[in-house]
């Protein structure tokens, strides 16, 4: 198609493009990008098409990246080439304050800070993989998330010292939106280092685990929704943890992402929404930029709509 328009194109594999990864086959992480070949081809006037989702380790073996690998490849190349922005096209025209299939007419976000967007993706927003956004944040690359089929509507995701520009609400504190996951495990047990390490080793990283840690117990919320074999992971955890922990399966989680997760006003709005929806959460978890509750899968959509109504559609005023 490029040549039909009068251009000249060349296709390169991930290894040919200088993408170096670790040894985690099928779920490799990009360690470095050395785009010498890409730069030479660009200098020669070629349009360079790079195969995403792949690279090579230091022994020259071909590896494949995990979920979101193509987007991560694009961001990694953009950073290595010194680009200010990476445009990523998909079947949606950017980021919304909730899933349009659950909330009627959610707000379209024109701009979101990359830290808040990483949190949003970790808790279930599907537009971009959290690893892709985190890499863009580290490299200082802005992302334009746009639709392949639509107009110029998009969301700009960028690093900023000021989180407050990530506004869904037009006034008050920034609440990016409400998101959810359908399949999480709750692990409640002895607050020993072995328990936490066992869970992390099985699920593959700290980003999959939320923790509420009272004095002598751990209350871990583990995301297994995107793992290749969640049933096997659950069985392995039951076997390795034994009587030291109680595992609750088939929990849904609903999260708000905000610049002010520790503000009392946000907490009150969160609680009021749950009460209005007649939801008694099984567990509650807090991170720097999010509040999460767990509930039965049947309560998930009702909880999303209630939180969106209380914390996105109405501004949260700090100090009011």
Segments and roles (model prediction):
Residues 156-320:
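A conserved regulatory-domain signal marking ACT and ACT-like small-molecule sensing domains
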Residues 8-10, 86, 143, 207-208, ...:
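Hydrophobic anchor at the start of a short beta-strand
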